[in-house]
Curated annotation (Swiss-Prot):
Gene: ctaB
Organism, scientific name: Prochlorococcus marinus (strain MIT 9215)
Keyword Transferase included in the entry's annotation: yes
Top EC class, one word: transferase
Protein's name according to its UniProt entry: Protoheme IX farnesyltransferase
Pathway it works in: Porphyrin-containing compound metabolism; heme O biosynthesis; heme O from protoheme: step 1/1
Length: 333
């Protein structure tokens, strides 16, 4: 291999190291590492988003704590079971070979017992402190991630994240059901938004890791179809995400106007980064930027939903409507 090729490989490796959580930069205890704690905050954020879409928001502190606590425990269990199932695969990938299980820092038995314990604790917390529907949906999310995505879809199809993304889209349903005892159309709206957002978000990361996935035979879209095809697919799902996000104006019980206004820069930035990647699909720095922004985007959507349910937002909407009708009245005279 000549020096030019080596430089290109080193450049790609450097960019991947920047975007993918590095054990060199953040060293977690083995027992915490297998729980995949980096994924949990966004799952809890979308749970809060589901709650904010209901008339019952805000929830009482005990119910809120039980819902988020149960969700965090279930997510930790799902992460541990995922690590357990993919232990042999992780051994074969340079990026993951030093993780707790493949490196022998934890035994399989210990991780399995911890996952079962977290699952039982999550179930008891949600059943006793929230309701059966929230508990059932949480368990559905856990098993869809472990069985549907990890075991069935991930090793078999390039559409793995399209259908497997249902696991990450269930928390809004948990939040809505925790608040009301049922899901409701607004909860399903946020479920749909997360489902559309997930492929664009994950494929941006998969572009960075396509060589890693290809080396172990995992059929991620960029590894099979290439970056150009993937960038076009990201664009389609990105536009669908933007259109779906706008529907939040109508999904909110109140405060939709302020949500719609604050949403504009989020969608504008998302489309800008998607367009930049589409122009240069092999530019790893652009894939990195899109991946990072997509995370902030979903956190931002959930924050906007919470802000829209404040009294300030309601007053803003009322005053805006008064001004609007005053202008109409002046124009008609």
């Amino acid at each position: 291999m000549n020096s030019s090729n080596l430089e290109k490989l080193n450049c790609k490796s450097s960019i991947r190291d920047e975007v993918v959580p590095s054990r060199k930069r953040v060293t977690l205890p083995p027992w915490l590492e297998v729980a995949k704690p980096r994924l949990i905050p966004l799952l809890l954020a979308t749970t809060l988003g589901g709650m904010a879409l209901t008339e019952e928001w805000p929830l009482s502190s005990p119910k809120l704590i039980c819902t988020l606590g149960g969700g965090a425990l279930a997510a930790a269990a799902a992460g541990a079971l995922n690590c357990l199932w993919e232990m042999e695969l992780d051994k074969r990938m340079t990026r993951t070979s030093k993780r707790a299980l493949p490196a022998g820092k934890l035994s399989s038995e210990t991780v399995f017992l911890a996952a079962v314990s977290c699952t039982l604790a999550a179930s008891m917390l949600l059943v006793s402190g929230v309701n059966y529907l929230a508990a059932g949906l949480t368990l559905l999310g856990l098993f869809s991630y472990v069985i549907l995505y990890t075991v069935i879809l991930k090793p078999r199809t390039t559409k793995n994240i399209v259908f497997g993304g249902v696991a990450g889209a269930i928390p809004p349903l948990v939040g809505a059901s925790a608040a009301t005892g049922h899901v409701g159309l607004s909860g399903w709206w946020l479920f749909g938004l997360v489902m559309l957002w997930t492929p664009a978000h994950f494929w941006a990361l998969a572009i960075l890791l396509k060589d890693d996935y290809a080396s172990v035979g995992i059929p991620m879209l960029p590894s099979v179809k290439g970056s150009v095809f993937t960038a076009k697919a990201i664009s389609r799902y990105g536009w669908a995400t933007v259109l779906m996000s706008i529907m939040g104006v109508f999904a909110l019980p109140e405060g939709g106007l302020l949500y719609g206004i604050m949403l504009l820069p989020f969608n504008g930035r998302l489309l800008q980064l998607i367009n930049e990647l589409k122009k240069s699909p092999d530019d790893l720095s652009r894939a990195k930027s899109l991946f990072r922004w997509s995370i902030l985007y979903m956190f931002g959507i959930c924050l906007l939903l919470l802000i829209s349910r404040t009294q300030l937002s309601v007053e803003f909407e009322q005053q805006s409507m008064q001004i609007f009708f005053s202008i109409l009245s002046l124009l008609s005279n």
